Each structure stands twice: as structure tokens, then as C-alpha cells.
Regions:
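Predominantly extracellular/secreted and cell-surface proteins with exposed
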Residues: 30-98
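Extended soluble regions of mature proteins
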Residues: 85-89, 95-117
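Compositionally biased, low-complexity repeat tracts
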Residues: 20-22, 42, 75, 98, ...
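Sec-dependent, cleavable N-terminal signal peptides
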Residues: 1-19
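Short linear motifs in intrinsically disordered/low-complexity regions
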Residues: 24, 53, 65, 101-102, ...
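Intrinsically disordered, low-complexity segments enriched in Ser/Pro/Gly/Ala and basic residues
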Residues: 12, 19-20, 44, 111
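C-terminal partner/receptor-binding element of secreted or periplasmic proteins
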Residues: 106-142
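Boundary/junction segments of secreted and surface-exposed precursor proteins
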Residues: 17-27
């Protein structure tokens, strides 16, 4: 049998490995833009897909998430666009925020549109202001 201090240390170490996650999908309407977003993130990496229907045309693609900042029920995520039907977006950084307000029957979850920019020219998941709007869908932040 392990001495008590070693057992407590082992238990604390095991509990510290629990990774955060952000999962779900939803559609937001923001002005004339309708954006559908799906997210699957565990720890500090994962993928997000987007479909944006706007007056300027339809754009879709995938973001490889490499930065995740979770504070309570709010997650700010960023990463690089790796696929898109608009080739000029590939290599750009996308950053967005999601707020998990509980189950679908509770207050709707919130999300921002994805803000795209050249890497290093604006904020990543560690900063930024976001206009949030209600989501038709459900996101889970753990």
C-alpha cells in the first residue's frame, strides 16, 4: 500500500489530466450573413468547419484550431484555415467565441461570426472583443 502523501499526489495528478473540450454546431444570423459553424476540440487542438452565406457570396471551409481559451462557459478559439472554396482564405487565421448557456431548452447559446485576418496581424484566442448573437443549435463547453 502507498503511503498517504503519495496516494494523494497520484490522485491529484490523475485529476489534473482531464482535458477541456468544445463540441457542437449551430447557425447564427448576423445582419445579412448566415453562418453555420461546427466545432470539435479537445484540449488545445481540433477542427471547426464553417459555411457562410452572405450578400458577397457563399464561403465554406475548415479551420485547424491551435489556440483555445476557456473561462467558465465561454470559449474563444483560433486557428488557421486549411481548406476553403475561396482559395485566398487558406492560411488566414480565424478567431471566434462561443458561450454555452446549458441545454437547448435553456437560454440559447451565443456565438460570434468568425473574424478572419492574416496570422500575427490581430488577436488570437487570448484576446479580443466579439459581437455575440443567439445560436440555433447547441454547443457544449467542458
Amino acid at each position: 500500500m502507498f503511503p498517504t502523501p503519495l496516494t494523494a499526489f497520484a490522485l491529484a495528478s490523475f485529476m489534473a489530466v482531464v482535458a477541456s473540450s468544445v463540441n457542437g454546431s449551430g447557425t447564427i444570423n448576423f445582419g445579412s450573413s448566415v453562418e453555420h459553424l461546427s466545432v470539435r476540440v479537445s484540449g488545445s487542438s481540433g477542427r471547426a468547419t464553417f459555411e457562410d452565406k452572405a450578400a458577397g457570396g457563399n464561403v465554406n471551409g475548415q479551420i485547424d484550431i491551435n489556440c483555445v481559451n476557456i473561462a467558465g462557459n465561454t470559449a474563444t478559439l483560433s486557428g488557421l484555415v486549411t481548406h476553403s472554396n475561396k482559395k485566398s482564405m487558406i492560411g488566414q487565421e480565424g478567431v471566434f467565441r462561443i458561450v454555452d448557456n446549458g441545454s437547448k431548452k435553456a437560454t440559447p447559446d451565443m456565438a460570434s461570426l468568425i473574424n478572419f485576418h492574416q496570422p500575427g496581424t490581430s488577436t488570437d484566442c487570448n484576446a479580443g472583443e466579439f459581437d455575440l448573437t443567439p445560436v440555433k443549435g447547441n454547443f457544449t463547453i467542458q
